[in-house]
Amino acid sequence: MHEPVTLRRATPDDWRVYRALRLRSLELAPDAFGSTLDAESPQPDEWWRGRLATSHTLLAEVDGVAVGIGTGIRDRHEIGSREIVGLWVEPEFRGRGIAREMIETLAVWARDAAAHAIALWVSDGNPARRVYERAGFVATGE
C-alpha cells in the first residue's frame, strides 16, 4: 500500500519547492515542456514567486514531501478557456494516480471558473499522453 497523497494549492511562499521540482522536470524530460532548463534555472526568486501568484499551481505531497506539480492557467489562445501546463510527477511516484488526481482537481478549478474548455499540449511520444487520454482529453492536432 502506498502512502496517501495530499494535493494543495501552492502559494508564492512555496517557490523554492516549486522551483526544485520544475527544474528537475526540465532536466529529466527536456522535450516535454514549452521551456528549457537553461531558460528557467537562472531566473530570480521573484520570477518564481510571480509564477505561483498568477497561476493555480498544485503541489502533490507524500509524507510532507513534494513529489509532483501541475498548473492551471488562463488559456493564452482562447478566451474563456483554461490550460493545464507543467504537469509532472517524480518518476518513483508514477503509477499511483497522482497525475490523474491533479488533472481532476485542475478540471474542477476550470469548471469553477466557468471555463468552456480545458486545453493542454503534449507531444505524441510523451508517456504522459496516456494519462491525459484516460482523463478524457482528445487530440485535436493543434
What are the residue ranges of the model-derived segments?
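Conserved GNAT acetyl-CoA-binding A-motif
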Residues: 110-123
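Flexible nucleotide-binding loop
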Residues: 96
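Extreme N-terminal starter segment of soluble prokaryotic enzymes
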Residues: 4-7
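Conserved acetyl-CoA-binding loop of GNAT-fold acetyltransferases
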Residues: 133-142
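Acetyl-CoA-dependent GNAT
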Residues: 12-92, 103-105, 109, 113
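Short glycine/proline-centered loop/turn elements that form peptide/ligand docking sites
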Residues: 99, 103, 123-128
